[in-house]
C-alpha cells in the first residue's frame, strides 16, 4: 500500500539543548539534538514518502533513521539563507513597542526572545511549498509534521503507513482547545501576541494546490 500523503518536516539545531533551568530558562524548555532525534525515530519509522530539510551535519542521522525508506533530504545553511529575516525578528523582539504589549508571564517563552525559534516555526509553509515547487511531491496530499511531534509511541500507534482520505478542497488544521470564535482579524492577531493557543502548529494537511493558497495567506499575515 502506498500512502496518498507525503510528509514534510525539518530540523535545525537552534541551541535548545542549552535552555536549561540552571541557566535561567523556563522549566522543561531544554531539548537536545539527541532528544529530538529520539522523537523522530517514531515519525521516521513510517513508510510514507518524506521530504526533510536539515543542516549538512545532521543529514547522515536523518538518513540512518529512514534506513532506505523513500526519502529526500534537502540541506540548508539556515543561518546564512535567512540571515536578514532572523535579524528582523530579533529587532522586533527587542522593540519596546512589542515587549510592552506582552503579559509578563510570556516573557520566558521562546516565541518572545529567540529569533531562531520564531524563524524555524514560521518556515513550515515555506518548506512545504519549496518541496512542491521543486517537483518533489508526487502524492495528492501533503502533511507538515513537526520533526519532534511523535514524543510518545502511541502517537503513531504502530502504523507502518499513515493514510487518511482528507478532503482535498480544504486545509486541515487540528485544535487542542475548544471554544474559539473568530470575530475579526484583529482578534486573531491579539490571540497570537497573547499566546492563546487553540490550533496545533505541529500537524497540517492539505492538497498541493491548497498549500500554495495557504502559503500566500501566511505571507500576508
Q: Across the structure, where does each feature detected by a protein language model lie?
A:
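Active-site rim elements
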Residues: 115, 220-221
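Extracellular structured ligand-interaction cores
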Residues: 4, 47, 125, 142-144, ...
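Beta-strand cores of modular interaction/reader domains in eukaryotic scaffold and signaling proteins
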Residues: 6, 51, 143-146, 172, ...
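GT-A fold catalytic core of metal-dependent nucleotide-sugar glycosyltransferases
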Residues: 116, 120-174
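N-terminal anchoring/stem segment of glycosyltransferases
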Residues: 1-112, 116-119, 123, 131-137
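Conserved catalytic core of nucleotide-sugar-dependent glycosyltransferases
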Residues: 149-220
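Alpha-helical structural motif
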Residues: 81, 124, 206-210
Amino acid at each position: 500500500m502506498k500512502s496518498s500523503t507525503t510528509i514534510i518536516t525539518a530540523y535545525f539545531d537552534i541551541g535548545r539543548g542549552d535552555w536549561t533551568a540552571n541557566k535561567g530558562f523556563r522549566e522543561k524548555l531544554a531539548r537536545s539534538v539527541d532528544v529530538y532525534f529520539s522523537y523522530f525515530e517514531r515519525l521516521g519509522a513510517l513508510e510514507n514518502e518524506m521530504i526533510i530539510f536539515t543542516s549538512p551535519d545532521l543529514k547522515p542521522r536523518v538518513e540512518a533513521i529512514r534506513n532506505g525508506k523513500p526519502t529526500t533530504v534537502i540541506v540548508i545553511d539556515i543561518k546564512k539563507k535567512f540571515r536578514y529575516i532572523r535579524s528582523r525578528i530579533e529587532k522586533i523582539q527587542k522593540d519596546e513597542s512589542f515587549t510592552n504589549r506582552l503579559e509578563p508571564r510570556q516573557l520566558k517563552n521562546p516565541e518572545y526572545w529567540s529569533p531562531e525559534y520564531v524563524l524555524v516555526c514560521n518556515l513550515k509553509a515555506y518548506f512545504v511549498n519549496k518541496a512542491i515547487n521543486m517537483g518533489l511531491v508526487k502524492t495528492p496530499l501533503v502533511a507538515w509534521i513537526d520533526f519532534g511531534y511523535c514524543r510518545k509511541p502511541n502517537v503513531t500507534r504502530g502504523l507502518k503507513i499513515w493514510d487518511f482520505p482528507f478532503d482535498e478542497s480544504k486545509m486541515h488544521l487540528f485544535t487542542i482547545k475548544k471554544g474559539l470564535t473568530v470575530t475579526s482579524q484583529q482578534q486573531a492577531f491579539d490571540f497570537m501576541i497573547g499566546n492563546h493557543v487553540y490550533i496545533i502548529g505541529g500537524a497540517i494537511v492539505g492538497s498541493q494546490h491548497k498549500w500554495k493558497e495557504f502559503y500566500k495567506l501566511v505571507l500576508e499575515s
